[in-house]
Amino acid sequence: MGIEGALDKGFVTTNLDSLINWGRTGSMWPMTFGLACCAVEMMQTGASRYDLDRFGIVFRPSPRQSDVMIVAGTLCNKMAPALRKVYDQMAEPRWVISMGSCANGGGYYHYSYSVVRGCDRIVPVDIYVPGCPPTAEALLYGIIQLQNKIWRTNTIAR
C-alpha cells in the first residue's frame, strides 16, 4: 500500500475519497461533553501520558470548530435538549463517541426517572466505549476505531 514505486514518473494517483478521509482521520477535533466521572478519564486521555496530539486530535472548546463529540457520563432529561442543541451546532460531517455505561445505556442509574437511557436516544452514536468508568486506553481504542470507520466511509460517492 506504499508509494515507493509509484513516484518514478513524478506523480501519484488516488481517488478523492481516500485523500479526504486521510485528512479527516489525521485531524479529528473532539468537543468534550463531560457530564460525570467519565469526564475525568477523558481528561486523562488528553494529558501527557496518552498524548492524543500524536494522533492529530486536539480538543476544541466550541462545537462549531469540532467534528467529534465525546459524551461522557450520565445524561439527565434536563441536559438532553442541550446535548441535541450542541450536536446541531457542529458542522457536517460529525461523529459521536458515547463513553461509559451511563452514556451508553443509563448505567447504574438506568431505572431513575430523570436519566436518559442512552445518549443514542438523543443523538446518533457512532462508537460506544464500555466501562464504568472506561479507562483511558479504552477511549483511545474507541477513537482509533472511529478513525478506521471514517477511513472506510465514502465521502463523495454516496
UniProtKB/Swiss-Prot annotation:
Predominant location: membrane
One cellular component term from this protein's GO annotations in UniProt: respiratory chain complex I
Transmembrane segments: none
Subcellular location field: Cell inner membrane
The keyword Transit peptide is annotated on this UniProt entry: no
Membrane topology, record value: Peripheral membrane protein
Highest taxon above the source species: Bacteria
Reaction(s) this enzyme catalyzes, per UniProt: a quinone + NADH + 5 H(+)(in) = a quinol + NAD(+) + 4 H(+)(out)
Cross-referenced PROSITE patterns: COMPLEX1_20K
Record text on cofactor binding: Binds 1 [4Fe-4S] cluster.
GO annotation, biological process: aerobic respiration; electron transport coupled proton transport
Keyword Iron found: yes
Enzyme class, first EC level, given as a word: translocase
Gene Ontology terms for molecular function: 4 iron, 4 sulfur cluster binding; iron ion binding; NADH dehydrogenase (ubiquinone) activity; NADH:ubiquinone reductase (non-electrogenic) activity; quinone binding
CC cofactor: [4Fe-4S] cluster
Swiss-Prot/TrEMBL keywords: 4Fe-4S, Cell inner membrane, Cell membrane, Iron, Iron-sulfur, Membrane, Metal-binding, NAD, Quinone, Translocase, Transport, Ubiquinone
Chain residues that bind [4Fe-4S] cluster: C37, C38, C102, C132
EC number(s) reported in the record: 7.1.1.-
Record-linked PANTHER family: NADH DEHYDROGENASE (PTHR11995), NADH DEHYDROGENASE [UBIQUINONE] IRON-SULFUR PROTEIN 7, MITOCHONDRIAL (PTHR11995:SF14)
Subunit architecture: NDH-1 is composed of 14 different subunits. Subunits NuoB, C, D, E, F, and G constitute the peripheral sector of the complex.
Purpose of the protein: NDH-1 shuttles electrons from NADH, via FMN and iron-sulfur (Fe-S) centers, to quinones in the respiratory chain. The immediate electron acceptor for the enzyme in this species is believed to be ubiquinone. Couples the redox reaction to proton translocation (for every two electrons transferred, four hydrogen ions are translocated across the cytoplasmic membrane), and thus conserves the redox energy in a proton gradient.
Family the entry assigns: Belongs to the complex I 20 kDa subunit family.
Protein name as annotated: NADH-quinone oxidoreductase subunit B
Species of the source: Nitrosomonas eutropha (strain DSM 101675 / C91 / Nm57)
